[in-house]
């Protein structure tokens, strides 16, 4: 899915998302105004998405599946 779709999915569905460039087991999930990664680290949403903009970051997002 696109970056915009991933952002909307994370907020509306509440399930973790990942980018195809993330390592196995890496994901973020929406927690209100912040994102939380797989280790519980709080990531400010605005900063997270600003860093991951343009180029390959605009596509390649998916729902995280730990299988």
Feature annotation, model-predicted:
Residues 1-67:
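Structural boundary micro-motifs
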């Amino acid at each position: 899915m696109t970056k915009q779709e991933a952002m909307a999915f994370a907020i509306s569905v509440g399930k973790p998302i990942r980018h195809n460039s993330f390592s196995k087991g890496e994901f973020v999930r929406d927690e209100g105004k912040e994102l939380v990664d797989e280790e519980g680290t709080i990531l400010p949403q605005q900063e997270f998405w600003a860093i991951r903009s343009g180029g390959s970051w605009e596509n390649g997002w998916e729902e995280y599946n730990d299988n």
